[in-house]
Amino acid sequence: MQTLNVGAGRTDEEYKEAEDQRRADLLANSRSDANYFFVAAGLAALGTGLLPVRLNILVSIGVLDLLGLYGRSLNPVYPLAMYGAAAAWVIMLLALGFAGRNGHRWAFLAGMLLYGADMIALIAMFSLWVFGVHAFFVFKWFQGQKALKDLQDPGASTF
């Protein structure tokens, strides 16, 4: 029986099985965290008026709030611009969700950057509850990108 120094008495076979299990767990965790892109897209559609019911007290997009506040002096194109920007936001979140589920770490980083920038706009609009919802998504996407980073690093420890 051959043992490895890193496995605390485990054989090569046991070590490989444990490593395969760790990799499977990390992949499952990253896919689970990528599903939050779809939740965010649904909440964004709910908060921006793309759905028949609008609930912008609990969920909102800071950039669209600023556009609504300062963009009212536009011409009759204003409602179309608001719906177009909201639809682009939702489509972007859906695309990031599919990319994240396929194991692309950049999707998580882009989502964190997108929502981090939007959190600045939310602070300007004094939407603290929505800021907390955004922070939750940023945290979940950070966990997803970290799982993919650990998955790509063969010597990473799970401790």
Predicted regions mapped to residue ranges:
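Topology signature of small-to-medium multi-pass alpha-helical membrane proteins
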Residues: 2-159
